[in-house]
Regions:
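Hydrophobic, helix-prone linear segments
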Residues: 1-88, 98-99, 119, 129, ...
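Non-catalytic linker/capping segments at the edges of enzyme domains
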Residues: 1-47, 137-191
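HotDog/MaoC-like acyl-thioester-processing domains
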Residues: 2-10, 68, 72, 82-83, ...
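Short structured motifs
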Residues: 30-36, 86-93, 170-173, 227-232, ...
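A short interface-forming secondary-structure element
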Residues: 48-61, 186-198, 203
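Hydrophobic residues in beta-strands and at strand termini
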Residues: 48-50, 92-93, 187, 233, ...
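Active-site helix/loop of acyl-thioester processing domains in fatty-acid/polyketide metabolism
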Residues: 61-84, 199-224
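Glycine/small-residue-rich hydrophobic helix-like segments
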Residues: 209-247
Length: 288
């Protein structure tokens, strides 16, 4: 069982050591190469290098990659609070087929006693005037850590870009049941937030994967470009296995939607997350 770091609040040394272990081992940010200067030792670097596994079959950047890179929640770091996500949205202006790197430009919207809000522009790092996506979100503080926590040392993962890289859903141990249903195994430390709940990273990846899969079945093609995503985290996903069930919806003008519900099977099939994704049909191609 993954431990909730809030159990260590009365022991600053143990809390700091556990946060270092958990943050340093969290797969979401390390796998896509996202550095958070508010948490990590080292220089500020808000760019992400785009690999083959971060693109769909048309070459567009995946909605889940934008979500992991800009998780929002009000710029509240784990050094000052125990944050939890509430709502996240992403609107894509440019799929970034020829973009090699993108930069996340986040701004604090408002921070209250418990609730916090932020938004970001995601731009082409080599041509900053080119906006790829807009994200925004809301987070909540569910605990207060000991004072004086130091920044974390995080060893980056060296992922060599290749067309043969496994899809992100496979990296996070996802499994397909059918066209509309996917699963993740029981909660493990590398996919858990410090408060012992399924991190937003695998949730972004698997809700998009289930949505795309369901629409591919409906539309008869996987050549789908992400348009938008909206995710509501309605309860902490604490146990697992987790089931992702998507409902595809056909629209007009080659636009398709999917509504996905996430259930914690280890907690009496509790509904923990709901997400909506929009895609448009496009000609299949390769990223240049």
């Amino acid at each position: 069982m993954v431990r909730d770091i809030r159990d260590l609040t009365s022991d600053p040394g143990a809390y700091a050591a556990e946060l270092q272990r958990r943050w340093g081992g969290l797969l979401s940010y390390r796998y896509i190469g996202r550095h958070h200067a508010s948490m990590n030792v080292g220089p500020v670097d808000d760019t992400v290098i785009v690999r083959h596994d971060m693109r769909d079959v048309t070459g567009g950047i995946l909605l889940s990659v934008f979500g992991i890179a800009a998780p929002e929640g009000g710029l509240v770091s784990d050094l000052e609070a125990v944050p939890n996500p509430v709502v996240h949205s992403c609107q894509v202006l440019d799929a970034g087929v020829d973009v090699r790197r993108f930069e996340v430009r986040t701004e604090d919207v408002k921070r209250g006693q418990r609730m916090a809000y932020s938004r970001s522009l995601i731009v082409d790092a080599d041509h900053p005037g080119r906006v790829l996506a807009i994200t925004e979100g809301q987070g909540v503080t569910i605990g207060v850590p000991p004072e004086g926590l130091p920044k974390m040392t995080v060893e980056p993962l060296e992922v060599i870009d290749s067309p043969d890289l496994p899809p992100l859903w496979q990296v996070f141990a996802g499994r397909q049941v059918d066209a509309t249903t996917w699963t993740l195994p029981e909660l493990s430390a590398e996919v858990a937030s410090p408060d012992a709940a399924l991190h937003v990273g695998p949730q972004f990846v698997m809700t998009e994967t289930a949505a795309r899969s369901s629409i591919t079945e409906l539309a008869g093609t996987g050549a789908l470009v992400g348009v938008s995503s909206h995710t509501m985290f309605v309860a902490r996903a604490k146990s697992g296995p987790f089931t992702f069930v998507a409902e595809p919806i056909a629209g007009g003008d080659a636009v398709f939607g999917a509504r996905t519900q996430v259930y914690d099977e280890g907690a009496d099939r509790k509904l923990v997350t709901v997400a909506t994704h929009l895609f448009r049909h496009a000609e299949q191609g390769r990223a240049s």
